Curated annotation (Swiss-Prot):
Gene3D superfamilies: Ribosomal protein S10 domain. InterPro entries: Ribosomal_uS10, Ribosomal_uS10_dom, Ribosomal_uS10_dom_sf. Keywords: Ribonucleoprotein, Ribosomal protein. The keyword Ribosomal protein applies. GO terms for cellular component: cytosolic small ribosomal subunit. The keyword Calcium does not apply. One of its GO terms (biological process) is translation. It comes from the Eukaryota. One of its GO terms (molecular function) is structural constituent of ribosome. This is Small ribosomal subunit protein uS10. It holds the Pfam family Ribosomal_S10.
Length: 60
C-alpha cells in the first residue's frame, strides 16, 4: 500500500490524472514439502504459502 501511495503522490505532483489503485484478487500458492531431507522415516510434511498481491494504477 505504501508503494501505491508513493506512486499516486508522485503522479499528482506532475499533474497527471490517477485512477486506482484497483486491487486484483490475491493469488495464493500452496507448496507442500517433506520435512526429512533423506526420504527415510515417518512421512511428515511442511506446508508453505506464497501470496501474490497485485494492484492496477492508471496514469492519464
Amino acid at each position: 500500500e505504501k508503494v501505491c501511495a508513493d506512486l499516486v503522490k508522485g503522479a499528482k505532483d506532475k499533474h497527471l490524472r490517477v485512477k486506482g489503485p484497483v486491487r486484483i484478487p490475491t493469488k495464493v500458492l500452496h507448496i507442500t514439502t517433506r520435512k526429512s531431507p533423506c526420504g527415510e522415516g515417518t512421512n511428515t510434511w511442511d506446508r508453505f504459502e506464497f501470496r501474490i498481491h497485485k494492484r492496477v494504477i492508471d496514469l492519464i
